[in-house]
Regions:
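Canonical Rossmann dinucleotide-binding motif of NAD(H)/NADP(H)-dependent dehydrogenases/reductases
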Residues: 5-41
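Hydrophobic structural elements of the Rossmann-like NAD(P)H-binding subdomain
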Residues: 15, 93, 146, 188-191, ...
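Catalytic loop of short-chain dehydrogenase/reductase
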Residues: 17-24, 97-128, 132, 139-183, ...
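A short hydrophobic alpha-helix cap/turn motif
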Residues: 33, 87, 138-140, 179-184, ...
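Conserved glycine-rich Rossmann-like NAD(P)H-binding loop of the short-chain dehydrogenase/reductase
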Residues: 37-52
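A glycine/serine/threonine-rich, flexible loop-to-helix segment
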Residues: 53, 162, 183, 193-218, ...
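Conserved mid-core segment of classical short-chain dehydrogenase/reductases
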Residues: 65-76, 80-85, 94-117, 136, ...
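C-terminal helical subdomain
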Residues: 125, 183, 190-193, 209-244, ...
Length: 266
């Protein structure tokens, strides 16, 4: 990233949630690597491991850990393996979310109990679990925990449904963790990108219309890019972000400030 050369040199970061080279997590990983960070990655299952391996190798990483964030034993094993390789962790990127695709369309009223619980567990509660396990590797020197959210957490977004509720919980967890961990020099923040063409976003009904609507109406007339989100992550994980914690940073072309669409487009 221009202007970011070396700002993360000497820092080690764990990236959780890279699905492919269009993932927001990958945009963050690439930017952090270009800024000098040494990276480790997690994935879930053999198929995602095969996708991740060439990406990890391209940024010089040979640390890949298979983990299921709904399984305590799996989390324990992954972080134990990481501690065997590294004696410290400077930043952790949590880019993990899931909801049943069949419930990311239609009425929120029809959300099932099972999918509500599963969406909250994977998309929100998992941040607490990974922060707890990262804590021993950060407590002596401080660090950064970073997650990803979306405007649907605070405003009704078509078809986002239970994910909006899960992201609202995630953002609240960011604030509580920031308060809890701040005295030990550990910062906790979230980036809220606008809609992006990722594997996760493709599961949401009508998402192409959402892309067009955001690009047409955002003050900057643009959607977020991997480069923009990556650059923001580098700032938050670097010493330049040393006094920023508990924040939700919007990277959405300014769309979040709007009260209504551009009237010229109505």
């Amino acid at each position: 990233m221009p202007g970011n050369d070396g700002v993360l040199a000497g820092k080690r970061g764990l990236i959780m949630g890279v699905a492919n080279d269009r993932s927001i997590a990958w945009g963050i990983a690439k930017a952090c690597a270009e800024a000098g960070a040494e990276l480790a990655f997690t994935y879930q299952g053999e198929a995602f491991g095969k996708r991740l391996e060439p990406l990890a190798q391209s940024v010089g990483s040979d640390v890949m850990l298979d983990v299921d964030v709904t399984d305590d034993a799996s989390l324990d094993a992954a972080f134990s393996a990481l501690q065997e390789r590294w004696d410290r962790l400077d930043f952790l990127v949590h880019a993990i979310a899931y909801s049943d695709k069949s419930e990311l369309t239609g009425r929120f009223l029809n959300t099932s109990r099972a999918n509500f619980a599963n969406s909250m567990d994977i998309s929100a509660y998992s941040l607490i679990e990974v922060a707890r396990r990262a804590h021993p590797m950060m407590v002596e020197h401080g660090g950064t925990v970073l997650t990803l959210t979306y405007l649907g957490s605070s405003r009704v977004t078509p078809n986002y449904n239970v994910m909006g509720v899960a992201k609202a919980a995630l953002e609240s967890a960011v604030r509580y963790l920031a308060s809890d961990l701040g005295p030990e020099g550990i910062r906790v923040n979230a980036i809220s990108p606008g809609p992006m063409k990722t594997l996760a976003a493709s599961a949401i009904g009508g998402v192409r219309r959402t892309y067009r609507h955001t690009e047409t109406n955002a003050p900057l007339r643009s959607n977020a890019t991997l480069e923009a989100v990556g650059g923001t992550a580098v700032y938050l994980c670097s010493d330049a972000g040393s006094c920023t914690s508990g924040e939700i940073i919007h990277v959405d072309g300014g769309f979040h400030v709007l009260g209504m669409p551009n009237i010229e487009n109505l």
